[in-house]
């Protein structure tokens, strides 16, 4: 008896269904590194148009977390897809190396008692250790880049170029020194940049304090009254009692309506809209009378006494005054608030600051000298109470600025700092704010809402405090006049001389510099080196100049910056400002892409205390990095990205669908040589030509749309749908009969293999930017061998087909697919009640509208192959309808179709006539399916 299983083309796949990614990926990485794939790619891509994604440097401290992984994976997908699109897309990874967190860690490890040069040396060593750890993890994620030559903000050349960027901004006229209130962290002992501030709830005392008017005659006139009997008070409300010793004025809103109210305390001035609530706080319900009303502009330049100090307090008009809460009058301490500073500056009031750099009151401050501002709060609360000027006291929970590192409350404190001015006219007559807002207009945003967010932040941001009183940072290499505080007139030339020294020896070249090496003897008497370092956001914000503009393989401006949504106030903004404030005069990027933060499946932030942290190291060790990459790509990054073990298991199912599809494709291509066996498109079976159209359209959607627009979640959805619907549930399902049962080298089978070859090459290229390990594993089989890489190739080129023929082909097969779905649905009840096992056991009678019926009948005897039934008949009717029944034919042992011609050919008693021809004759021919 013949064993017909040996006559079918069931081939083993060289691409296993189990990926075993966690085990295989490290070995592949080692091999790629040894082959110098990144370097080879640079040679291959030489001369192509450039695409530059500039890496926002992660901070060199601690292991990478899942947010880092998302960021680097998204960048890598872009670099790979741009490379395959025909660009030269080098990727230079970087690290942010200076700053307080490293200082804190070094102090923990080694203490504080050491020479500053040794301290900086230890900071440099610590940063290098952290970089080595993080680099290993980034490489493990499959991120392609120049890992042997990354940029570090602590590289001598980068430090030197950061100093040069400072020189650029100095020459542009935006740098100035001022004693302004800035966000100050008592734990850091330093001012903070806007990006280093976070807001969380804090409970604070809320008090109403009365300021006695000096001249009630002038007050009466402001309210249009002939006179006022008794005492009168302006009442303020504040949640920062510790600032009252620095109170130098009270601000009223020029257009706000104020009432003069007679109360048991005396005459009180309160905003009309807030008076009722204020009087309730003071417990005044009886003996109240509204005497008059006026607007805030009439109160300007009235004078009061301080509620507990001997100090004259003028009434000012301030635009910052609102009637949202409080009393409508604002106690004004220019040393402790930006708006306070601005209004006092307008009136020429000289700033008084009673709080030192440790957050303690100076010795001249009565009662609270030597106390920290937080210790002093209860003492200061007693003070106006003793003078009879405390009207109400309570607690309030409100959003308050905290240090992002120490999580402790900040204070506004006036300090001598260096600023980049937002509204100061530069050497070109333009303000930095105007330039930056124009630069926002010239930038493309992904997602689009990023534009409004960045624009509003730039519109509202204060001047940028760029100086820091720290040790581990790029120095502000200026010489400052000892008496006037002015910069040396030759600062630009001196900066360049210092930069040249730093390029040779690093920042220590400045810290160890004797000023006599660069200044004349006379200048040495009058000028000192500035001891400040630069804000680390200036370091990273200057990398477009220190890295992108300097490295030969890169081009300025970068095409794309890609970071988390917090970087609108961080790196995106600092880079924008340095770009606009320098001679470049524009943003250093053309596009900005923002991704959300990673949360758990319930939308909660990752937290060790909750126990919901998903570490990337755990994911790639258990599932493989390709699963993590597929998760990142399949999630809409414009919002929060949810991750958990359950979510990763679902992602694994999608991966399995793609992998199983590839395994099937490779199995059926294992005896196919595209040079010798390919069938010209015009001679291919019709459904094979249709499948090529589907594959080409998929490639067009991804290569022409989703990848260039960074819509990776749509790309993944489309790939999985193509594998499961177009291939798995339709084309490959139909194709199995022809692949397995026709002669191995028949035109019918070679036509199918020709289609599969094009589909497979295209599919591997399409998945490779996302599934970089799986893509390379597959390319080893269908590409040019082990030394070849999928990255060395651009998108697949399909055989050409004219538009009219394609449109007709798609229309026809769309109708056939619709009919097939109806047939499948009609057979389902027969399967459910065990009348038939598979659809091949059934016959179908189809009623269809005329056009569809024409398409179906055009397939002739091959219609049954397209519908996966043993027999199909078609007749014309108004609507699509299918009647299915069990076939009365006999099952062919070889093809499993049920026919009435099993055993019709002598010597082939258990197989159908078609199979007999395929085994012993010339083989069947196919035209349609």
UniProtKB/Swiss-Prot annotation:
Zn(2+) binds at residues 892, 895, 912, 915. The keyword Metal-binding applies. Its EC number is 6.1.1.5. It catalyses: tRNA(Ile) + L-isoleucine + ATP = L-isoleucyl-tRNA(Ile) + AMP + diphosphate. One of its GO terms (cellular component) is cytosol. It comes from the Bacteria. Its cofactor is Zn(2+). It is an enzyme of class 6 (ligase). ATP binds at residue 608. Signal peptide: none annotated. GO terms for molecular function: aminoacyl-tRNA deacylase activity; ATP binding; isoleucine-tRNA ligase activity; tRNA binding; zinc ion binding. A motif ('KMSKS' region) lies at residues 605-609. GO terms for biological process: isoleucyl-tRNA aminoacylation. The keyword DNA repair does not apply. A motif ('HIGH' region) lies at residues 58-68. NCBIfam families: ileS. Belongs to the class-I aminoacyl-tRNA synthetase family. IleS type 1 subfamily. Monomer. IleRS has two distinct active sites: one for aminoacylation and one for editing. The misactivated valine is translocated from the active site to the editing site, which sterically excludes the correctly activated isoleucine. The single editing site contains two valyl binding pockets, one specific for each substrate (Val-AMP or Val-tRNA(Ile)). This is Isoleucine--tRNA ligase. The lineage of its organism: Bacteria, Pseudomonadati, Pseudomonadota, Betaproteobacteria, Neisseriales. The gene is ileS.
